Amino acid sequence: MSGAMNLAVVTASLSREAGGMFEAVQAPANLLQQRGHSVSVYGIEDAALPAARLSWQVGTLRSFAVKGPARLAFAPDMGTTLASEPHDVLHLHGLWNYPSYAASRWNHKRSGKLVISPHGMLDPWALGNGALKKRVAGWLYENANLRSAATIRALCKAEAEAIDALGLKVPIAIIPNGVTLPEIAETPAARCNSRRTLLFLGRIHPKKGIAELIESWAIAVRQSPALRDDWLLRIAGWDDGDHLPPLVTLAGERGLTNIDFSGPLYGEAKEAALAGCDAFILPSRSEGMPMSVLEAWAYRKPVLMTDACNIPEGFAAGAAFRIENDPAALAASLIDVLDRPETLADAGRSGRALAEKSFTWDRITDQHAALFAWLAGRGDRPDFVVQ
């Protein structure tokens, strides 16, 4: 692989409003720029962008105003601007909104190389959520966009299989998300209070299984006085669609006193939450590859997660405990796992080792660069292109 490439990255939000996708988009873009490539990023203006702008270390950052409903991300100036740019490769993150349509226009007009990262949006559960809107978008532009892509990037084998099942007949590259590894002490810091903390940190949305988690927590604390007295369930994250109030009501109806709703956490507050928790939980129904799990491992925390989180390496490495969404089954897992401090500590160490081995951003960016070089005619087909 030789020579600098002219790369474009297209996404919706350029700020923390993107949730886990923010770092998943920004980190490789910044690193590719640092490695000498020309990286231009195109996205949507939102209220949180001013605080995030300086963290983008790319050649060009272009933000565009939205007209109409925010969820559609209709920014016509993006499409007009993008269509005139002669990039070697364009990497689109996300589907079902105007940036996807703008990327499709670029691909059609420039005859370029389009890479699409759905980030789990083509998984069966995700396709069934808001199905009517997605069928309309598919008919209007998205189906043709997917079929015209040079490559669709999957985060894991399960996502690749879900994409392949759609019959798009497009090469699929498996490139996982990465994580920034913090410096952590070999000996954990002294506890600030007597209770241990089980942390959920992510988007507040039904697919995350938070209602089931609260129900299971209520069952578990009734059955286990030790869990009730020794553990706190902390639910942190931004509310995507006014789903938080019913969850707070549910916790009150169940009489839970060892539960805390912390709201969205960013920067140092997020780092403190990860560093200070004793275990991390993600009872999701559908994921691409959750950044939050990788971040928990980076902080040497044991993880409780469902198979839908799509990181089977965690189970194989002893870094994660398999859980289910069913409240009774999940309650049993909570009582069992959280009563084994040494096992939890071992899992946390295994998680950190797994993150160091497989999920550093340098490693993941190597794969991005190899894929783009192949598509630009400057390198061989990578072995992680599986279809």
Model-derived features with residue positions:
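Carbohydrate-associated surface elements
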Residues: 158, 178
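Nucleotide-activated donor-binding/catalytic signature segment of Leloir-type glycosyltransferases, i.e.
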Residues: 245-265
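Aromatic "clamp/platform" in nucleotide-sugar-dependent glycosyltransferases that forms part
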Residues: 285
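Conserved acidic donor-binding segment of nucleotide-sugar-dependent glycosyltransferases
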Residues: 319-328, 336-341
